[in-house]
Design a protein with these regions (language model features):
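Short, solvent-exposed loop/turn segments at secondary-structure junctions
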Residues: 47, 72, 114-115, 149
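Short, active-site-adjacent cap segments at secondary-structure transitions
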Residues: 48-50, 129, 151
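Short glycine-/acidic-enriched loop or helix-start segments at secondary-structure transitions
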Residues: 51-54, 77, 118-121, 153-154
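A structured binding-face within diverse protein domains that lines the active/interaction site
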Residues: 94, 111-114
Length: 175
């Protein structure tokens, strides 16, 4: 299932990514969890993932945006301080070169390959987010994905997997 969904996402056009990402951001900006959040964990989109980066410029100086930095078996987060402070990390994804953020994260915007109606998530398979989320039980977790990535049937999940508080697609929000 993971490979099929990733392939379908990679086939999206630039216009489809921009349109659907804008629809998701529009919903997100109306949600109290985002409005009230001081610290927001983002991600750098790869392979046509939903692109939330326009929020960085729009809310610059109003919110602290964080991005993941991966290590061999773990993930930490660092504040975003402009594109010129981003360097490709060990997985080839741009990461901030700022000091590690140790405070509370109000809202986490989490990518995924597949989500279900019960807000379970399948990621890329490395377990980075699940291990990280377990250390932040009080943070609000929103999954973001395209409509075709949200399945009506349950996706496989285990005890160590973390359910999202909400899943947002261009068409709907569940949670």
């Amino acid at each position: 299932m993971r490979a099929i969904m990733e392939q379908r996402r990679r086939m999206l056009t630039k216009e489809e990514v921009e349109k659907d990402s804008a629809l998701i951001m529009s919903q997100l900006e109306q949600m109290s969890a985002f409005v009230e959040a001081q610290t927001v964990l983002m991600y750098y989109p790869v392979h046509n993932e939903v692109d939330l980066r326009p929020l960085l410029a729009k809310y610059q100086g109003q919110k602290t945006f964080l991005f993941p930095v991966t290590h061999r078996h773990s993930m930490e987060v660092r504040p975003y301080d402009g594109e010129d402070m981003m360097r490709k990390g060990r997985l080839g994804v741009p990461e901030p070169q700022t000091p590690t953020f140790k405070g509370h994260i109000d809202l986490m915007l989490v990518p995924g390959v597949v989500f279900d109606q019960h807000r379970h998530r399948i990621g890329r398979g490395g377990g980075y987010y699940d291990r990280f989320l377990s250390k932040h039980p009080t943070s609000i977790k929103y999954g973001v994905c395209y409509g075709f990535q949200l399945k009506k049937h349950d996706v496989p999940h285990w005890l160590h997997d973390h359910k999202m508080d909400r899943v947002i697609t261009p068409q709907q929000s569940i949670g």
